[in-house]
């Protein structure tokens, strides 16, 4: 199929096929990232959270050095706790450490254990792949998703490339979830929540983390369908805090 035409002038199914093909082919199939005419070391423009700034960042301050040392000590404490998860999983100490912010180095593992991702994956072998393929049949949803994906965390180094790896994973998860939970389908708030999960989790793990947050026994009251669909600013702040209080406050 010719890829150079405008996909939005094609019938719905044609639009969906072209969008999916662009993501599958990766960044080279899409628009180039504008980094200027000269090659630059992007690390000089990227902060510790992965946000790419327009200007080169100043050298690390004494305060930042102190904060990093503190983060390292907290990471060691978390590593010991994660290694003995059965002992700590339902304790007050765990809750306190979560609200103090989970260190970035162990955040993915902590989220995985908190959301019981390994268990839900083992109970649903191959389910994510099936849902991903099923979701790709809905061109209307794919069109909505790709518009939001292109504007999600677009200044973060993992999502800065149009049709890059992380944008592809984000699109795939949202497409799969729309098929997995048709009652919710797709809502634009899901794009940012899922992208934050992808910062610390592999693709399939991020999918199951999303399902646990939206429908798991422990979290379903926070992420009911009624809360998500209105998309109000207040309910979005509540959902973001429940989902990502560690990363949003780091």
Curated annotation (Swiss-Prot):
Its job: May act as a GTPase-activating protein for Rab family protein(s).
PANTHER family with a match to the protein in the record: RAB GTPASE-ACTIVATING PROTEIN 1-LIKE, RAB-GAP TBC DOMAIN-CONTAINING PROTEIN
InterPro entries, sorted: Rab-GAP-TBC_dom, Rab-GAP_TBC_sf, Rab_GAP_TBC_domain
GO function terms (MF aspect): GTPase activator activity
Keywords: GTPase activation
Every Rab-GAP TBC domain range: 101-250
Lineage: Eukaryota, Metazoa, Chordata, Craniata, Vertebrata
UniProt superkingdom: Eukaryota
Keyword Nucleus in annotation: no
Disulfide bonds: none
Protein name: TBC1 domain family member 26
């Amino acid at each position: 199929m010719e890829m150079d035409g405008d996909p939005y002038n094609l019938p719905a199914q044609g639009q969906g096929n072209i969008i999916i093909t662009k993501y599958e082919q990766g960044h080279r199939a899409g628009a180039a990232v504008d980094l200027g005419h000269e090659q630059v070391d992007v690390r000089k423009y990227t902060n510790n959270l992965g946000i790419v700034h327009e200007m080169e960042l100043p050298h690390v301050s004494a305060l930042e050095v102190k904060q990093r040392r503190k983060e390292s000590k907290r990471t060691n404490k978390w590593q010991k706790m994660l290694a003995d998860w059965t002992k700590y999983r339902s304790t007050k100490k765990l809750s306190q450490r979560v609200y103090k912010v989970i260190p970035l180095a162990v955040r993915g593992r902590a989220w995985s254990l908190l959301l019981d991702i390994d268990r839900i994956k083992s109970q649903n072998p191959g389910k994510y792949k099936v849902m991903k393929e099923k979701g790709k049949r809905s061109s209307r949803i794919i069109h909505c998703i790709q518009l939001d994906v292109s504007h999600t965390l677009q200044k973060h180094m993992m999502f800065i490339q149009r049709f890059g790896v992380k944008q592809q994973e984000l699109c795939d998860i949202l497409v799969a979830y729309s098929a997995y939970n048709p009652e919710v389908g797709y809502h634009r708030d899901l794009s940012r929540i899922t992208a934050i999960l992808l910062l610390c989790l592999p693709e399939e793990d991020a999918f199951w983390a999303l399902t646990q947050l939206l429908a798991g026994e422990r979290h379903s009251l926070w992420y009911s369908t009624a809360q998500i669909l209105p998309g109000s600013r207040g309910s979005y702040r509540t959902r973001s805090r429940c989902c990502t209080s560690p990363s949003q406050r780091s």
